[in-house]
Structure formats: C-alpha cells, structure tokens
C-alpha cells in the first residue's frame, strides 16, 4: 500500500489481502514470535521437528502450518525471513499513516477475520477511492493459506477485467 502511495507510476493495480490501511498496534502476535524464536533456539533439522515446538506457543494449527512453509533449516534463523528484524520493527510495521492511492485496488477479506471490519470501509475509501472488496467466507486472516483457490480466482478476475469480483 505504501509503495502504491509513494510510487503510483509503477503500480498499475493493487491487491491487499486481509489488512486495512489503519494502525493495528499490538495484534496479539506474541505467541507467533515466541514460537518462531523457540524454533530458532531449538535448531530443529526438519519441519516435523519444528512443528511441535511451534504448536507449544501457537494454538491455531493453520498458523503453525503457515509458519512451517517458511521453515528453512539451513537459514541462520531457520526461516526464510529475517525474524529478528521483524520482531525489532514490529511496532513500525503495525503503525500506519493515512495515504492517498488512486490506482484500482482490491481488498480481499477473510469472512471470519477481525482485520477488516465493516466500520473500516469509510476510512479505506477515503484513502483508496478506486477500491473494491471481496469477502471469502469460511476463513480467517490467513485467507490465502486457507482458501488459495478462491483468492487466486478473485485476483485473476480483478487483474484481467478490473471488476469487483
């Protein structure tokens, strides 16, 4: 979203998956960080070894599975992302300053997710006047992991026809 605001000349269309352009503060990701750092400390050599370590900290099995997709035993922090940098910059990542984005934008929301609420619509349209939205029922925040076929179909329709899906 920030890239589209800062450099609209290089963004033709924008797709945002289950996040609203507003500050989130602490959204309860501490369990995820604790699980990831526990894996880092235990130094497992396989996903099978990492899974129970994550599951001790993260109650939702779908989040455990999603985190395991980035597990890489040969990486310095055992994941394909910089865990320390994410943790150290978490507050900055969760903060938000309003922007103005005119490119066509699709917001995809998980039907059971708390990340985009009905009351957020006005603030979204103030910042993204060319926005449309699509809700995928029966999934939460990890909509792209829970219902990838529906997400891909929504993205394809938006990119190919510039229509609200």
Regions found by a protein language model. Name each.
Residues 27, 42-99:
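Conserved alpha/beta-hydrolase catalytic His-Asp/Glu region
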Residues 1-45:
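Flexible "cap/lid" loop of the alpha/beta hydrolase fold
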Residues 15, 47-53, 94, 108, ...:
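A hydrolase-biased, glycine/serine/histidine/acidic-enriched motif that marks catalytic-domain neighborhoods
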Residues 131-165:
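Catalytic active-site module of serine/aspartate enzymes centered on a nucleophile-bearing elbow/loop
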Residues 75-127, 132-135:
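Conserved serine/cysteine hydrolase catalytic core
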Residues 19, 110, 138:
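Cofactor-binding loop segments of dinucleotide-utilizing enzymes, especially the Rossmann-like FAD-
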Residues 5-9, 126, 153, 157:
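Short, well-ordered alpha-helices that flank and scaffold nucleotide-derived cofactor binding pockets
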